[in-house]
Curated annotation (Swiss-Prot):
Keywords: Virulence
Gene: cvfC
Function of the molecule: Required for hemolysin production. Contributes to virulence in both silkworm-infection model and mice.
UniProt keyword annotation of Flavoprotein present: no
Name of protein: Conserved virulence factor C
SUPFAM superfamilies: ARM repeat, Hypothetical protein SAV1430
Organism the protein comes from: Staphylococcus aureus (strain NCTC 8325 / PS 47)
Amino acid sequence: MEILRIEPTPSPNTMKVVLSYTREDKLSNTYKKVEETQPRFINQLLSIDGITSIFHVMNFLAVDKAPKADWEVILPDIKAAFSDANKVLESVNEPQIDNHFGEIKAELLTFKGIPYQIKLTSADQELREQLPQTYVDHMTQAQTAHDNIVFMRKWLDLGNRYGNIQEVMDGVLEEVLATYPESQLPVLVKHALEENHATNNYHFYRHVSLDEYHATDNWKTRLRMLNHFPKPTFEDIPLLDLALSDEKVPVRRQAIVLLGMIESKEILPYLYKGLRDKSPAVRRTAGDCISDLGYPEALPEMVLLLDDPQKIVRWRAAMFIFDEGNAEQLPALKAHINDNAFEVKLQIEMAISRIENGDEALGSVWKQMANRTI
């Protein structure tokens, strides 16, 4: 049995080890401590300092490490364990790409458009929080005897967030309460009880002018305006540019999200403002928008992010260079080859390898999918 390759996963604490051997029993096992009844190679891996558990299914292992353990120390020990036991090859093939490093997916559970629970999901963790009791009470008021609650409730995608999951939850809760103020709940209940309310796609979309937005003193109202904003056009850029200077992070982040919907090179200077924002969440969101748009003209700005203090931002920069970069970015990549975050270092190495091997820059996964439909 040999190691064919080692691949990063969306979780920074998990690596996928692909083997040359496929289990014939089609079963799966999770191992957390050394036991005599277990395969010898599993016990060897569990004996490595820093490894906390191993999941074995089909032809791969999912190896989990302690949060403070270092993959750069652990991976050579994993290879050595297989080499000692099976005399396998020392080399490991090029890792595959993790397109979602550091992301926390935020969702809002609603019933007939009335929100009552938040769910956050990262690669290795899920966190839920119920909204204040008044939201649950109004959701209950919206129910009728004929409603199928399980069928009619919906998870609304609130987009991705970045950072500590509990801090993200606190921020998302603040955003949701601003977007759906208690004063609006009776209106939502009234709408929910209307006879023709057969679908559960209720959402307010309302365009606001620059003057109306500028005249609003309450940041929660400004955020609500942006959250209920229809797909923006070029005429909305002055309003969104103003929102980029807002004192509140959720407002600036939502402005970036809306700017990213204007699929044109003309919005790049505004996204660059997001790259320089003091909040790493806004910087990463701006980087994600630029990556989705896939304009190589953004490469000089993204190269600068290789020096960002936050690894989730540096990783996005390295990923964009992998997707869109060329030989011009090699000096910058090599200057950052020893990044102290393993995930970033790995992505930089992959970008260098692709460029030096002369492989074509295919763009982001989103861009590749879009190109296939043309």
